[in-house]
Amino acid sequence: FELLEEDRLTVSDSVIIEIFQSLYYPNNSYEFGVIDPYIIGQIYELFLDEALVIREDGHIETQEKPEVVDSQGAVNTPKNITDIIIEETLRPLYENRTPEEVAQYRIADICCGSGNFLLSAFEYIVNYHIEYYRNHDRENAERRGDIYQLAGSTNYILSYERKRSILKNNIFGVDIDPLAVEVSKFSLLLKALENSSLEEAEAFHQRTNQRILPNLDENIKNGNSLVNMAYARFDRSVYQNVSLMNKLKMFDWNAEFGNRKFDAIIGNPPYIRVQNMVHYSREEYDFYKSNHSPYVTAQTDTLDKYYLFIEKGLTLLNDGGMLGYIVPHKFMNIKSGAK
């Protein structure tokens, strides 16, 4: 087939408008506005396991990514589980504190996937603000526009401006899969818009001259949370090897997020045993086992990737910070856990 030359291709505005209109009622039987962001994340995660591959005969097919095969597939953590982990992790940080005291808390998932843990964290923080204002400062909060009641309901809603601020200031994530990063951003933006009217969002824009949807590029980033620039000391030729650079996706935490650490690290790190890690990323495995590796648990015979995520998470925490992971129970009883 021949590639289309973009400069010679012209598409009428009416065609684009028709495409968009076909996605919505009454031209489409699906009402995307009522789909829960968690469901969208689960749908997308079905496709994050696969990559397009060009075969030797020139045909294109989808194949499971090697790291997914070796870890028996990506695991989508159910919402009821993420909610429990978030409750246990964030409650000690938020309990008996004011919105001013928690305004600069930084919550991160360093293997965020499609963003389920970040969605639960965002929801927890939003609900914390609603309950605080209801119980301590309701009249002033209503007057300021921080909360308001839904028509015909006793339930309170946090203003879109406050939710937008929480997204920008409190929620952070990293994932090695660029598609997962985009899904996380998309899901979080949908969650922020939940229960907010178009009129409220437009009023915010007119009052502040800011975009209705915040740019989350500085919050949710693509990279390898476990491999930093120390890899270049292990393999000095890495900067001359573009394919290896693209594979490793070295991530400089200070450059990407500044010197500030996090108040909570949450997530469900991948479980990939050392034997499987060698198959899809020998370079990564050799780095973890080298003298340049910052990971103590990597020197054990029973290395599993989630060990490294525990170590990395602990190094990224502020004093008094909280780590909330789902890990196999055996970790508490083996030598690697003791380290």
Region spans (language model):
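Non-catalytic nucleic-acid substrate-recognition regions in nucleic-acid-modifying enzymes
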Residues: F1-Q42
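Residues that form generic nucleotide/phosphate-binding pockets
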Residues: I19-L23, L46, F287-N291
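SAM-dependent methyltransferase catalytic region
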Residues: Y30, H59-K339
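Conserved alpha/beta core surface patches that mediate binding of polyanionic ligands
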Residues: G33, I39-Q42, E50, Y148-N155
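Glycine-rich, acidic and aromatic/proline-enriched surface loops and short helix-turn segments
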Residues: G41, E45-V53, E87, R91, ...
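Short, helix-capping/interhelical loops that line the mouth of catalytic, cofactor-
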Residues: E56
